[in-house]
Amino acid sequence: MELKTLDDKDLKKDERLYIKGIRLINSVKIDYKTQKHVSFLVQGDNELHNVMYFDEKPQDKKWQCDCKWYTLQDKLCSHIIAVNLAIKNGKLKIDQ
């Protein structure tokens, strides 16, 4: 599975969420990995969130989070942004 991170343009679309994502980078951990998806844990301000990457889903649904923002808005959240930034910045290694 080749994990595809989001474009910088998409990550920076909402400046407030992007800044929060930067702040959360160090709280990102890999939970588990299968052949078709990867589960990440992100410690948010108040609770632990699960971010999932689904290889087999369409591009706009590959990244999902269990937080209220993502669930209600169906838009990128700071937790998904944090995972993407951690991968892009080399703070999180995904074995291919």
Regions found by a protein language model. Give the residues of each.
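Long, low-complexity, compositionally biased intrinsically disordered regions
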Residues: 1-96
